[in-house]
């Protein structure tokens, strides 16, 4: 195997040393990157099986495990190897380990992936250990690992080289395991509640369902400009119209060609659903049940930490109409204000810089964002939105300037947006045409009317409640993550050259 002469001729540069060891290994053992290795159990399974093994007890049980080497002590006599779910100590000694296996030890570096067969014991100090009988090189790592206990200190590098971040940061690793569990939990909850999951187009010839700047591309064969979807709403409503199901949902990515922040990524995950014969109050109940279920699955309780706060996903959540919240915060009674001009005057008198063409509803929503949003720390539903900014929602009976819409807030973040969906085809067309004219006035000349959707709604859409949940923000809360980039495996970032 590796003689002293080979060791003594190795370079002092860490990367070069690994390359030289790889060359020696190829010469001495042949295949250094085998296609297959059979484990008898994972590290986690091993730990669970022998959790009651007493200290200083050695079994005759022989197991085979594999993992990445995270630490090596006493010239490889003690090594810790990790797989995705656990750590096991490997012990190699002349009394228990054949010479052929021990001869491989000088060639093993931190970061290499090895397979080990041996007997199970627990040391006097209580460490579950395998006495190595055979050691197999499975992957020779050509680059040193970052320092295990501190991980990557450069935040941008953590996002650029997420594989190293997860490799060296147990918090990051756990967070993405929890993300997977949350996504599964959303799907399981929705299916158990009778919803059918569908997939709607990511590439759309007409974008809609939200107000946002899309990413544009071109289909060469069809000779057609297309857009990455900004929302699945109109296709999900067409599915509801079809009668395929009365309860439909989708969990998938949306794309918006807009800014990047701690709460915004241009590619993000949404859960959107539509429930026939329900209204926005039914959807509020659904949100509360879903959030409580997810908190219990991750934390075992509805209360959990976020930063220096304790959040509670135990329903019912606080419910407050937007005009009432603004009146309480500022003293401005928007229900008593009759015209757009009066709304602008009242807003300016209270010190708010509003635009000269803003409507009553735009003034109300702006003041809410400025004065109320930041106070919504515990989960809250804000209801009764202005119709001006809610083109797809039904009017509140007796209050035609307001609609049956709510947004769910927590930690001052918007987590969800829901409506009693507009299903009057004539009113829907009028509002969509008005929205299109506003978009064109803003310079969004590519925005088009979705005639296929309007044709479908002419066929008749049942009354329904609709909901969109920002899954990434919800995961941020449930995993105590300060930035959306901490919960997206490979977030958007500037190129390395920038």
Curated annotation (Swiss-Prot):
State any GO CC term.
cytosol
Question: What reaction(s) does this enzyme catalyze?
Answer: tRNA(Lys) + L-lysine + ATP = L-lysyl-tRNA(Lys) + AMP + diphosphate
Q: Which residues take part in binding Mg(2+) 2?
A: 414
Which Cys-Cys disulfides exist here? none
> Which cofactors, by name?
Mg(2+)
Q: Which GO terms describe its molecular function?
A: ATP binding; lysine-tRNA ligase activity; magnesium ion binding; tRNA binding
* PANTHER family, A to Z: LYSINE--TRNA LIGASE, CHLOROPLASTIC_MITOCHONDRIAL (PTHR42918:SF15), LYSYL-TRNA SYNTHETASE (PTHR42918)
Which named protein is this?
Lysine--tRNA ligase
